[in-house]
C-alpha cells in the first residue's frame, strides 16, 4: 500500500514505557532513536512530558516520563542523522506543567501529543492551544473511544473540529477492542463531525488485530499511523513498526535498522519484561475492558495463564 502522504510515528519508548515505568537504559533509547533515523521514520515519540512531584518522582517512574531537554539532547547527539525524525512527547491531562515546556525554537522537541478521555476534552484542548502557542505541532488523542457514550464523543469531536490549533485528531483503540468494521465506523464518525482535521490511528493488539486494523485505517484514509518496534507496548502491545514498513512499500523507508534493533535490543529486553498477545489480553479486548485487570493477573505467577477463570470473573 503506497501513499505518499502517509507518515509513521514510532512510540516505542512512550508506549513501551508503560510496562516498566519508563526505566529504559539510555543505551536502549539511543538505539531506538538510531533505528528511527536510519529507517526514515517521520516522528519518534521519546516519552511523556509530565510534572515531577513528591509522589511522582523520576526515581520511581523513570526519566522518560519527564523528558528533560538535556536527556533528549544526549540521545539526539549520539547519532548523526541527515533527515532526523520529528521528536514528540505526550501530555497526560492533569499531570503536566506547561511552563516547563520551552518555546519550540529553543527545544529539540517538535510535537506535543495530548492524551485525554472524552470527559476531559476541554482540558485536553487547552493543553493543545498552549502547546501550539509555543510553536509545536500538536495532536489530540481521544482515548477509549470504544467505551465512550456516542453523543458525548460526537460533542467532543465537534469541539476539536473548531480548534484550529489541533493538527491531528487521533482515533485510539485503547482496549484493543476494535474489529476492522469498527475502525471504519468510528473513522466515518470522526470524519463527519471533525471534517477539518487530519486523522491519526493508534492500535492495541489485544485480539491480534493491531496490524490489520492499522491497514484498515490506511484504507479509510488515515495518514498518521502509530507503531512500535516489535509491537512493544502496554499489555498486548501495539502495531509492529517493522510489519507496517513492509506493508507500506514506500522507498523512503528502510526496515533493516528496525530488525537490527529488534535483534540486538528488543529480544534481550523480552527476557526482562513482557508484552504481546496472550489469551488474558484477548479476553479483555473482546470484552472492551481496560487492560489493568489483565495486567494484574499476568503479574501473578500463580494464576497468570488462568484464562478460563479470568473469563468467568470478567463476565460475572
Language model regions located:
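Catalytic cores and adjacent flexible loops of soluble metabolic enzymes
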Residues: 1-316
Amino acid at each position: 500500500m503506497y501513499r505518499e502522504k502517509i507518515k509513521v510515528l514510532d512510540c516505542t519508548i512512550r508506549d513501551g514505557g508503560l510496562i516498566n515505568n519508563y526505566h529504559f537504559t539510555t543505551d536502549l533509547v539511543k538505539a531506538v532513536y538510531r533505528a528511527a533515523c536510519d529507517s526514515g521514520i517521520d516522528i519518534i515519540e521519546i516519552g511523556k512530558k509530565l510534572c515531577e512531584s513528591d509522589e511522582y518522582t523520576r526515581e520511581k517512574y523513570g526519566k522518560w516520563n519527564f523528558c528533560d531537554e538535556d536527556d533528549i539532547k544526549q540521545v539526539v547527539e549520539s547519532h548523526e542523522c541527515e533527515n532526523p525524525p520529528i521528536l514528540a512527547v505526550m501530555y497526560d491531562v492533569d499531570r503536566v506543567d506547561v511552563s516547563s515546556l520551552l518555546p519550540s525554537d529553543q527545544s529539540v522537541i517538535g510535537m506535543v501529543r495530548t492524551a485525554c478521555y472524552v470527559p476531559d476534552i476541554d482540558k485536553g484542548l487547552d493543553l493543545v492551544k498552549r502547546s501550539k502557542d509555543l510553536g509545536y505541532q500538536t495532536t489530540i488523542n481521544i482515548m477509549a473511544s470504544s467505551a465512550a457514550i456516542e453523543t458525548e464523543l460526537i460533542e467532543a469531536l465537534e469541539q476539536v473540529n473548531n480548534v484550529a490549533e489541533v493538527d491531528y485528531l487521533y482515533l485510539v483503540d485503547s482496549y484493543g477492542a476494535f474489529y476492522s468494521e469498527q475502525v471504519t465506523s468510528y473513522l466515518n464518525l470522526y470524519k463527519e463531525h471533525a471534517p477539518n482535521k487530519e486523522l491519526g490511528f493508534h492500535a492495541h493488539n489485544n485480539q491480534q488485530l493491531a496490524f490489520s486494523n492499522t491497514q484498515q485505517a490506511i484504507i479509510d484514509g488515515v495518514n498518521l499511523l502509530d507503531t512500535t518496534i516489535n509491537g512493544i507496548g502496554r499489555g498486548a502491545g501495539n502495531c509492529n513498526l517493522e510489519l507496517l514498513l513492509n506493508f507500506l512499500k514506500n522507498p523512503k523507508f528502510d526496515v533493516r535498522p528496525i530488525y537490527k534493533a529488534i535483534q540486538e535490543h528488543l529480544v534481550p529486553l523480552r527476557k526482562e519484561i513482557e508484552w504481546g498477545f496472550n489469551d488474558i489480553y484477548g479476553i479483555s479486548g473482546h470484552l472492551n475492558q481496560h487492560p489493568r485487570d489483565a495486567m494484574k493477573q499476568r503479574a501473578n505467577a500463580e494464576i497468570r495463564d488462568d484464562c478460563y477463570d479470568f473469563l468467568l470473573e470478567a463476565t460475572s
